[in-house]
């Protein structure tokens, strides 16, 4: 019993230890997996752990990490130790998680943090303690949470270096005085306060300067209170998603000077005719206001504004008016803005884009006396109404005009109307459909910049003014560029069909040119250097033929990398196939590909030298003789076989030199042909067939003779025909393998005097007896007896 009772606690402890070990073992691989999956940082120590389904900040953070992206996970809590080791963190992205709680000293080690994004989480309150250690923080995003206020005091009091702040959410309802204490300057402040219901006056006055203030507030009373505070600190005020329904209340009432707001932007706002008039009057009260902008707004009216009230108010200080994508619900009932003429005299910049403008009345256009910049891009302007919009004396000071993306069809007609703008310098009429253009056009005399891109022009003509310094004809159907523009400094030819660079002599002062996305295959050193003033050349995205000449120029031209825009990654070889897709700057062609002519010349030279050496060697070693004899032998072999014995006509064929003919014909012939029985001799003088080729006569005579007599002398070895006879006899020795040759030494001669190529004859002379003509008459009888015996053998 005692032992059993003692074993129970022991077993219990073992089970507990096993469970703890199992839990740790299961948790350890999870942490290792998180380290491997998440903390894979790049060279700048930026770690991306977004969209990984993490429930907590992963362990393993080190002091090397500078950027940590934990966005779009399921993190609910930031604990004290989570970021303790990440002391060099500059950017921390925690947006779109489920964070509802942050320990007070969670950011205690992040003294170097510059950007913190806690947006779109579940924070129900903000604590100044969180941000206390973040004295280097410049950008803070806390919008999209669930807090209803910023607390009783300022949560940002310690953020002395804060530059941009974005706050607010659908539950955000109150801003109290003191909420922004500690912040003196902000580059950008954005408040999402669609449901903001209470604003304590003066709450934003603690911020002395805000470069860009963005607010979204629906309640007009709250909006008015906020605006009155911002008029003294904001430089650029942007109001989003508001529907103005002011009547007698003035936005600037109770405001004291000086007012600082210089730019006012309405984004997504709705206006009526009634409120347009009141806003125009109210804005005149803001004497610092220089720029008014409306983006994606809706006008619920017909343009029936109270011009009398507007005219009675102060003169407007606005110099720039920009309207983009304005929707007029009663567009076809809209008035012609009569009466507004007196309000536009000080405008310097006017932009009405994407708003269906089809005409400006001439009488109104003449009142824009100070206007320098006019932008009507993406509207409904047409040629037959352009004369009304740009009539004589209209827009008298205009220097820049943008009529791009309208419905203009005739360049000649458009140019004629535009010529009324005598001070015009810059003109953009791109994205109209002009097509063919005439040879002559009338332009303003001071025009320097012309944009004709995307206008379906197939060919440029002298319609283009010669005064231009900048010309853009990109995205047309141009095959070439042949205009003479002596003052041109910038030329844009992107997305055309040009195969070569333009002639530099036509545009001698060109500084920058873009000819990307054309059909340019290459350009030479001469073409490139002909542009003396060229500083920038964009020839990227062409199909380059990487020839040896082109590559040699590219690789050796000094400073070309500083001139070519997009070099080297945007310059790709299209051919030859072996280097297609490679960067032009990295391609090296082989010696054979680059110096083919030189290599062929070298090969030809080597072949010539080889043949020359063969000729010299052949001459020295009688190669010509071997070839001629081989040919003759082959010719002889093609004839019928040697005649049988009954066809032998001669006992001997006599081969001798003409200089030895006296001895042969007067002595040897008499001795042999008058012997008993007589010998039949074949002599070339007597027995050769007339008209027959000499070589054939020699071959036939040798083959029809039983023996061949060679009368050797100094004259013999010098005779060409004697050599032929020796040659064929030499072949006969090989063919029949018998001794058919009889050598007679008419005078003493060394065996070495016989050419070395006649190895068989030399062998006969060296190994067998030959007959030598004796000068002694007593021995001559013995000579004849021996010769006759040799012939009979």
Curated annotation (Swiss-Prot):
Disulfide bonds: 41-47, 362-391, 441-463
TM annotation in the entry: 598-618
LRR repeats: 64-85, 88-109, 112-133, 136-157, 161-182, 185-206, 370-391, 397-418, 423-444, 446-467, 468-486, 487-508, 509-530
UniProt keyword terms in alphabetical order: Disulfide bond, Glycoprotein, Immunity, Inflammatory response, Innate immunity, Leucine-rich repeat, Membrane, NAD, Receptor, Repeat, Signal, Transmembrane, Transmembrane helix
Any one cellular-component term (Gene Ontology): receptor complex
Domain LRRCT: 542-596
Topology, Cytoplasmic side: 619-793
PTM entry text: N-glycosylated. TLR2-1 is more heavily glycosylated than TLR2-2.
Protein location: Membrane
Gene Ontology MF term list: NAD+ nucleosidase activity, cyclic ADP-ribose generating; signaling receptor activity; transmembrane signaling receptor activity; triacyl lipopeptide binding
Signal peptide positions (record): 1-25
Tissue specificity note: Highly expressed in ovary. Detected at lower levels in heart, lung, gizzard and testis.
InterPro entries, sorted: Cys-rich_flank_reg_C (IPR000483), EF_Hand_1_Ca_BS (IPR018247), Leu-rich_rpt (IPR001611), Leu-rich_rpt_typical-subtyp (IPR003591), LRR_dom_sf (IPR032675), TIR_dom (IPR000157), Toll-like_receptor (IPR017241), Toll_tir_struct_dom_sf (IPR035897)
SUPFAM superfamilies linked to this entry: L domain-like (SSF52058), Toll/Interleukin receptor TIR domain (SSF52200)
Superkingdom of source: Eukaryota
Function: Participates in the innate immune response to microbial agents. Acts via MYD88 and TRAF6, leading to NF-kappa-B activation, cytokine secretion and the inflammatory response. Does not respond to LPS and responds with less ability than TLR2-2 to mycoplasmal macrophage-activating lipopeptide-2kD (MALP-2).
Assembly and oligomerization: Binds MYD88 (via TIR domain).
The protein's name: Toll-like receptor 2 type-1
Organism: Gallus gallus (Chicken)
Classification lineage: Eukaryota, Metazoa, Chordata, Craniata, Vertebrata
Gene name linked to the record: TLR2-1
